[in-house]
A protein has these predicted regions:
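N-terminal beta-strand motif that seeds the catalytic metal site of vicinal oxygen chelate
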Residues: 1-27, 84-88, 136-158
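Acetyl-CoA-dependent GNAT
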Residues: 64-70, 135-138
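Vicinal oxygen chelate
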Residues: 20-24, 79-130
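Core segments of cupin and vicinal oxygen chelate
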Residues: 8-10, 17-60
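Conserved catalytic-core motifs of GNAT/GCN5-like acyltransferases
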Residues: 17, 37-45, 112, 134-144
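Active-site beta-strand termini and strand-to-loop segments that position acidic
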Residues: 53-56, 123-126, 136
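Short, P/G- and charge-enriched loop/turn segments at secondary-structure junctions
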Residues: 4, 72-76
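Short, charged/polar surface micro-motifs in flexible loops or helix N-caps
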Residues: 56-60, 66-69, 92-95
Length: 158
């Protein structure tokens, strides 16, 4: 069993680094269309460029193969996601889906309500990213007492 997380957390930020062949198009899509504010940008030798976009609160979602297959089935109806899929919580999944598709994203599957009460859409975005847009339809507190919700630690307590 793993050690409990200390009160003072050692990790301060999760940063997902994505290589984009068409850097300008990817930055414009994620910054200007999806609306992720630019925190910083740097240039280096040999046309090296990077933009760091603020994406709000970050979490690392670890799923086993069965969960990945289930999510693909719910959101898309077939296996589709690569090993990494980027999910963005939005306030209006349908409106943001429409906005991103208009800007060039590929619609993989339109918004669908999930068993855990979120509205999820799947898109193909620049830099080869598969994107889930999700809109929460209930708060964590509203879900807490429902079957299947909680934490792994709660489910495996002796």
């Amino acid at each position: 069993m793993s050690e409990p997380v200390p009160v003072e957390r050692p990790v301060l930020q999760l940063r997902l680094v994505v290589e984009a062949e068409d850097y300008d198009a990817a930055v414009a899509f994620y910054r200007d269309v999806l609306g992720l504010p630019e925190q910083a940008a740097f240039e280096g030798v040999g046309d090296a460029r990077v933009a760091i976009l603020e994406a709000g609160r970050a979490t690392l979602e670890i799923a086993n193969p069965a969960q990945k297959r289930m999510i693909d089935e719910i959101e898309v109806g077939r296996p589709t996601a690569p090993g990494v899929r980027v999910a963005f919580e939005v306030t209006d999944a349908q409106a943001m889906t429409d906005r991103l598709v208009t800007a060039g994203a590929t619609l993989v599957a339109p918004p669908v309500e999930t068993p855990w009460r979120s509205l999820n859409a799947r898109l193909g975005g620049p830099a080869g990213l598969q994107i889930t847009l999700f809109q929460e339809l209930e708060t964590l507190d509203e879900r807490r007492d429902k079957s299947g919700f909680g934490t792994d630690r709660e489910r495996h307590e002796d």
